[in-house]
Amino acid sequence: MLPKANMRAAFFALAFVVALAWGRPSYGGEPAAGFHVPVEYYKLPNGLRVVLSPDHTAPTVCVGVYYRIGFRIEPRDRTGFAHLFEHMMFQGSANLGKMEFIKLVQSNGGILNGSTRFDFTNYFEVLPSNKLETALWAEADRMTGLAVNEDNLKNQQGVVGNEVKVAVLNAPYGGFPWIDLPMAANSNWYNAHNFYGDLTDIEAAKLEEVKKFFATYYAPNNAALAIVGDFDTAEAKKFVEKYFGPVKAAEVPPQPDLTEARQETEKRIAKTDPLAPRPALAIGYHMPDRNTPEYYAMGLIEQMLIEGNDALLYKELAQKRGLTDSVEGGINMLGNMFNYNGPMLLAADVRYDPSTRADDVLKAMDAAIDPLREKPVDAQLLDRSKVKLRSSMYDSMGQFGGFGLMDMLASFALFDDDPARVNALDQKFQQVTPELILKTAKEYLRSGNRTVIDLQPKPKDSATPAQQ
């Protein structure tokens, strides 16, 4: 498994991103009193959600288009389809040939990427600010009409299939725990299927299915456009209307039922990995619903348990007992606690020495976790967690040429119809009390709400051959 910070950039990422040659202002550390992100939000008649957040600190602009279709609700019997379609979006559009979108952005001094996540697929560019119109024209061009043919589909099926072989089937800890935990912890198919994709499903995708998928989900009324950086608001609005205004809305099907029943008993899964050099253990707890008081409390519990060398799990497992040298995990292993919109897990995983029993590792983890369920947390620990989360949150806003902030604004527009809630987050976390931490931990950190995966290496003489 990649460390969480690296996975965010690498998972489902296109390999052509070039180095970012400029910076964005950092929002990290302790922001000044009254810190405020400028947000203007409106919708076009065709339903496109538009978020504008000007910042003239650096002469760059970040443009992101988020479609409300991730791998969570991809078609049954077509696992991996959302990811496959992400690749198809770079195979040409009405006025741009195959891979010309990439060349256009890079030739204008920019970077670009696309990714598939639980609840959205996104595409973004960071460009010099005088190239804003270029980015908007290009994104609208492929929203208007995708150039899809049998040759492109077969080519990308091969590319995605190879990714599955390299990243999952033939890699140590290939799907552990970022694929394995959701599949084991959840019972609803939408949350529990193999989202990276089964090779058989990927190879079975038909051209007509790709066209239908595009016509259904890649529509303005199923998307959010966010622009962050150095731009004139009035001019940006004109560009948005000019290029996205004519795009026709589609009849988007309602979201399926994603709910999970309350888990009552602990689940334990045993897994063998012939390529793993060491055993590993992962735990995952079902999260509260988004935007509830308990949700914000879990954000702080994540800081207490997992984030940094002062985290409770690291101190107990690494510093005190010497069972591991690192603890990975967090809320939403493929993003963060803000950019998803369905059932989610707070997860942690460790790799440990073969001489140690898995039960002993789990007991050590419980030794760090259980005190949060037994009495109100120490005020000093809670305050430190609030500072850590605040610093991390504002640092993320300045990442990748404004991508971090753009990601939050687009997610809040897409899922909550309220991107301005970015300015209310700090207050929500500040309202969390020791009593709320205790209440939340009692319900959500109980063993009955937990799934445990025990991964053991296979003996070398019984290892299975890698898939070709």
Across the structure, where does each feature detected by a protein language model lie?
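Non-catalytic, conformational "gating/processing" segments within enzyme and secreted inhibitor domains
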Residues: 150, 157, 166, 174, ...
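Active-site His/Glu-centered metal-binding helix of metallohydrolases
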Residues: 81-89, 301
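Bacterial N-terminal signal peptides
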Residues: 10-21
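N- or domain-start disorder-to-order transition segments that initiate the globular core
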Residues: 32-58
